[in-house]
Amino acid sequence: MALKFNPLVSQPYKLASSARPPVSTFRSPKFLCLASSSSPALSSKEVESLKKPFTPPREVHLQVLHSMPPQKIEIFKSMEDRAEQNLLPHLKDVEKSWQPQDFLPDPASDGFEDQVKELRERARELPDDYFVVLVGDMITEEALPTYQTMLNTLDGVRDETGASPTSWAVWTRAWTAEENRHGDLLNKYLYLSGRVDMRQIEKTIQYLIGSGMDPRTENNPYLGFIYTSFQERATFVSHGNTARQAKEHGDLKLAQICGTIAADEKRHETAYTKIVEKLLEIDPDGTVVAFADMMRKKISMPAHLMYDGRDDNLFDNFSSVAQRLGVYTAKDYADILEFLAGRWRIESLTGLSGEGNKAQEYLCGLTPRIRRLDERAQARAKKGPKIPFSWIHDREVQL
């Protein structure tokens, strides 16, 4: 890899493997869901004999369930009206929303073939490493069924029927509908570009959705909304940087595509951060402890279980390219933490319990600590090797 980071903060896209913090008062007793623990390497025959009819290529072996005390659910019931007033306005009317076709060649027009030719000519000017990052971002967006599933694991705010009229459920469905356009648009662009192996990309998407994700939010909406606040900010940054680099390479249409997606992510970030702001008003102690808990566990990116059927380190390798290009970096991770802590006024919280004060102290000292570690890592960094990516027909890209 191009960079190795201290365990305090993994590469921004990389799943961190840190020990869980001690049980805190904002949690109820934990229920652990255990799968098979680590074991010595087995032969391929032994592995095959142990497999079920279908086994995801990436499995999470330890998960914590329902860590929020049941009485805290009342907080989210009490926020229902506020959610309607403060959350739903951040959704856009479908009739006024952009659609993928607004940015792509029109297949019904006489000039369709010429438009595709122009798109492909612009795409030829983009380097392979840029396409690796753009494909990785698209695959992340295409795993949307997983993210709706994740939101519907959260106690007190899930869509109980699939068409629930509660504000929480309406938001989740409409947020999903807005996000759905992102993967559609990038997928169609990449298909038309002629620069990528669509079958390998489609396999990666299927593998990823089948594997799911483990954000370690524990069915707990405190943790869940902190996670989504961070994630929406991260995707805003990432798509914004791919937009900037597309412009630098002369593809103004692709820059517009990525910039439009980034604007959506920014709007969604605003909605999720408002939920956490309200939680800090109602339950500052529980919320600051939850924030510290998520940061101790580290924010794992949604596509951390990515696999293409070949590369066991695909996600790490994709992350290294994103880090090297400056699309999403350890510095961005620290910047997002600093932004959220400032937005939520963590430093100025008062009246906290002993545990809340410890969480506050930890959060206030974390950003400079991450920055110091990143600076040391960059000073020690060596040039990464070149490896093939199946997404771009096994052409080699430097990590």
Curated annotation (Swiss-Prot):
Transit peptide: 1-34
A biological-process GO annotation: fatty acid biosynthetic process
Chief location bin: plastid
E.C. number(s) listed in UniProt: 1.14.19.2
Keywords per UniProt: Chloroplast, Fatty acid biosynthesis, Fatty acid metabolism, Iron, Lipid biosynthesis, Lipid metabolism, Metal-binding, Oxidoreductase, Plastid, Transit peptide
Signal peptide stretch: none
Similarity section: Belongs to the fatty acid desaturase type 2 family.
Entry protein name: Stearoyl-[acyl-carrier-protein] 9-desaturase, seed specific, chloroplastic
